[in-house]
Amino acid sequence: MTAASCPPVSTLTPARVVARVFLPFAAGYFLSYLYRTINAVLSPYLVAELGLNAADLGLLTSVYFISFGAFQLPLGLLLDRFGPRRVEASLLLLAAVGAVLFARSHSAGELILGRALIGLGVSGCLMASFKAFVVWFPTARLPAVNGWVLASGGLGALAATAPVEWALRMTDWRGLFSLLAVLSFLAALALLLAVPERRGEVAAEDLRRQWQGLMAIFRSPLFWRTAPGSVLSQASFLSIQGLWAGPWLRDVAGLDRVAAADGLFWVAAAMVGGFLGMGQLAYRL
């Protein structure tokens, strides 16, 4: 069933909104965070097979964030222009292509290109979710709903720890990324087929007005009060969680691969608890 054949919005109960709006977008952000943090567990396998060094691993991990971050400004314009469903579904198809390329890579350069495509492909997962939730959920519930979608990303981070280490006993990292490519394609398909259209998702403004609105954000004192703290905290945490915590636990703390993955699991679990707790706290206060 396509979005055009979906039942009228008025017939969607809250449970159906959760099933047909929240869950498809949450699945996308789950994959986004799984891709983001998987290198902490995957790195020794890449080193063993392809001979990557620490600089290669650092670049391989960071290129996800470079392509992800570089696309945020055009992403906002695209979300306003075409709506979150179309934009995120299209981008997730790029993530699927990137995962296929990563799975077939035989050099650091090929891995970097694949991961750059993955970063670009999942760059809209969180912002598209926020955009969709604004028009589908009551304003009073948005902090809690946003907390839940952030928690779905945390579940992706959980999946990138001990579950990935377990999966690597069943297959190799190439097979794992082939599976992730299929999951990315299915997530894109779910967005296209399950999520209905709703008035308010697409802006009627032309590109010039959209750009003026974007520039107004950069002139806001509130933006400049909050941005530095967000940048510093996210940069440090994501570099540790997304890569360097794994090698440190294995090479410095002396843990084996399974124990290191278990340690990363509890880091991600604490993050999920924080997402859920802060969302509920914001709703109640």
Roles of regions detected by a PLM:
Residues 39-40, 222-268, 272-275:
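Extracytoplasmic gate region of multi-pass secondary transporters
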Residues 20-54, 240-246:
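Extracytoplasmic
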Residues 109-115, 225-226:
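Short hydrophobic/alpha-helical segments at membrane-entry points of transmembrane helices
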Residues 70-108:
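Conserved MFS/SLC helix-loop-helix module at the cytosolic interface between two early adjacent transmembrane helices
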Residues 6-14, 196-227:
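Juxtamembrane intracellular "pre-TM" segments in multi-pass secondary transporters
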